[in-house]
Design a protein with these regions (language model features):
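A contiguous pocket-lining binding segment that forms or flanks enzyme active sites
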Residues: 153-178
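Short hydrophobic beta-strand that contains or immediately precedes a catalytic carboxylate
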Residues: 37-40, 125, 177-179
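N-terminal entry segment of metal-dependent catalytic domains or homologous docking segments
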Residues: 1-64, 130-136, 140, 144-149, ...
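A short secondary-structure junction signal
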Residues: 124-127, 135-138, 143-146, 154-156, ...
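Catalytic core of PPM/PP2C metal-dependent serine/threonine phosphatase domains
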Residues: 56, 72-135, 163-170, 234-243, ...
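C-terminal catalytic subdomain
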Residues: 169-378
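Helix-loop-helix
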Residues: 58-101, 197-226
Length: 378
C-alpha cells in the first residue's frame, strides 16, 4: 500500500504582509499500484502566483492519470506522458490568462514538481526550484532533482520557461517527498551539499517513518496524526527561521521491509568558516573580504586575540589562492572529456537529451486536442 498526504501552509512572511499562500499541493491515485504527488510554488513577485500554482498541480495530475500506461516495458512511454503533462500544465496557465487576463502572463508564474510512485518504481518531473527527495530500500536518501535558477538566483518558472527535468530513479523507492523551497531548503540545505549525507535525515524522517511497516487498518488515523504533528511543528518557534510558504506531498510504501533504524545517517562535519569564506569571496575587493571574514571570526570567538584571528584568515585566504591557481591550470589543459566519458557522467535515470520520438509523436498529434480539453476545463 502507498500511504500519502499533502498540505500547504502560508509562510510567516506572507502572514505578516497579509499575502495569500502561493503554494499548492495534491495527491492523486492512478490505480491501486500507482500514486501521484505534486507541489507547485507560485513565484512571489507575481500578482496571481496562487492561481498559477493551483492550475499547475491540478492539470499535471489529471493529465498524467489520463494518459499513464497501466504497464509498459518501455520507460520512454512514461517519460513522454510526464513531459506532455508538464507542457499541459504550462499551456493551461496560458489558456487561463488568455481568457481572463490577456497580456499578463508574467503575473502567472510557478514552479512544479511531480512524482509518480509504485512499490517498485519512481518517475519524476520538475521545473523551477521546488525539489524532490526519495528514500530507497537500503535506507539512503537521494536528492532526485536539481533546483533550476539562473546566475542571479532567479527561478526558471512555467509557463515562460519549460526546462523540464524528467527521469526515473535507478533504485527501489520506499518514499518520495515533493516539496516547495520553503521546506526543501531546510531538508536539503546548502550547508550539506558536499556532505556524505546531503539530506537533513532526522528532519526528513519526520515526514516518512510513521508509515514504515504500517498496517492497512491503522493507515488513515496514522496519516492524520502525522500530518497534524508536522503542521504543528512547522508552525512552532522551532521553525521560526522558515518564513516562506511551505508545501509537501508525500508517498510512502507501507509494505517495505525498511525500518526507521535502518535509515543511514551520520552527524555532519560542517566547516562554517569555509562556507563564510566562500560567501565573502564574491566581493572583488580583498580588503572587503578580509574585513567581513574577520568580523565573522570575532563574532564567533569574542575571546580570541587579533593574532589568532589573523592566523585563521591567512589559512582560508591561502586555500582560496591555491584553488584559484588550480582552476587557472585547468583552463590551460586541453579538455580530455571524450563523448564516452560524458555519456558515463550523465545521470542514468534522466530523460535522454534528444527528445524521444515517441514524445514528438504524442505532442505533434495531440497538442490541438489536448489544448481544447484544457479550454473546456477552464
Amino acid at each position: 500500500m502507498i500511504s500519502s498526504y499533502c498540505f500547504s501552509l502560508v509562510g510567516r512572511d506572507h502572514i505578516k504582509n497579509h499575502i495569500p499562500c502561493h503554494d499548492s499541493s495534491l495527491i492523486k491515485a492512478i490505480s491501486s499500484s500507482w500514486k501521484i504527488a505534486v507541489v507547485a510554488d507560485g513565484v512571489g513577485s507575481c500578482k496571481h502566483a496562487e492561481i498559477a500554482s493551483e492550475i499547475a498541480v491540478n492539470e499535471v495530475a489529471e493529465l498524467i492519470k489520463k494518459q499513464f500506461p497501466p504497464s509498459s516495458s518501455d520507460e520512454r512511454a512514461y517519460f513522454s506522458v510526464i513531459h506532455a503533462a508538464m507542457h499541459g500544465a504550462a499551456n493551461a496557465i496560458e489558456v487561463y490568462v488568455e481568457e481572463n487576463d490577456p497580456g499578463n502572463e508574467m503575473q502567472y508564474q510557478t514552479t512544479l514538481a511531480v512524482a509518480i510512485m509504485s512499490s517498485k518504481c519512481l518517475y519524476y518531473g520538475s521545473a523551477g526550484d521546488s525539489g524532490i527527495i526519495a528514500l530507497d530500500d537500503q535506507g539512503n536518501y537521494h536528492l532526485v532533482t536539481k533546483k533550476q535558477n539562473d546566475d542571479l538566483g532567479r527561478v526558471y518558472s512555467i509557463p515562460t520557461n519549460r526546462l523540464f527535468e524528467i527521469g526515473r530513479a535507478n533504485y527501489i523507492p520506499v518514499a518520495v517527498l515533493c516539496m516547495t523551497d520553503g521546506i526543501y531548503d531546510t531538508i536539503a540545505p546548502v550547508t550539506l551539499q558536499n556532505n556524505k549525507f546531503p539530506v537533513n535525515v532526522p528532519f526528513a524522517n519526520m515526514f516518512v517513518t510513521y508509515a514504515l511497516g504500517l498496517e492497512k487498518f491503522k493507515e488513515p488515523e496514522a496519516v492524520e496524526s502525522c500530518k497534524n504533528s508536522l503542521i504543528k511543528y512547522l508552525q512552532s518557534d522551532e521553525c521560526k527561521h522558515m518564513t516562506d510558504d511551505m508545501s509537501v506531498a508525500a508517498l510512502i510504501n507501507t509494505n517495505s521491509d525498511l525500518q526507521p533504524e535502518d535509515i543511514k545517517w551520520e552527524e555532519p562535519q560542517i566547516d562554517f568558516y569555509a562556507l563564510k569564506w566562500n560567501e565573502v569571496s564574491l566581493y572583488p575587493s580583498i580588503e572587503t573580504r578580509n574585513k567581513l571574514f574577520k568580523e565573522f571570526i570575532r563574532e564567533k570567538n569574542p575571546e580570541w586575540t587579533e593574532r589568532q584571528i589573523d592566523e585563521l584568515l591567512e589559512k582560508y585566504s591561502k586555500t582560496d589562492a591555491s584553488s584559484s591557481a588550480t582552476d587557472d591550470m585547468k583552463k590551460l589543459t586541453p579538455d580530455s572529456d571524450t563523448k564516452s566519458n560524458q555519456d558515463e557522467k550523465r545521470n542514468a535515470s534522466s530523460m535522454p537529451e534528444v527528445q524521444l520520438e515517441l514524445d514528438k509523436e504524442m505532442m505533434g498529434k495531440n497538442t490541438r486536442g489536448i489544448r481544447g480539453f484544457w479550454k473546456k476545463r477552464s
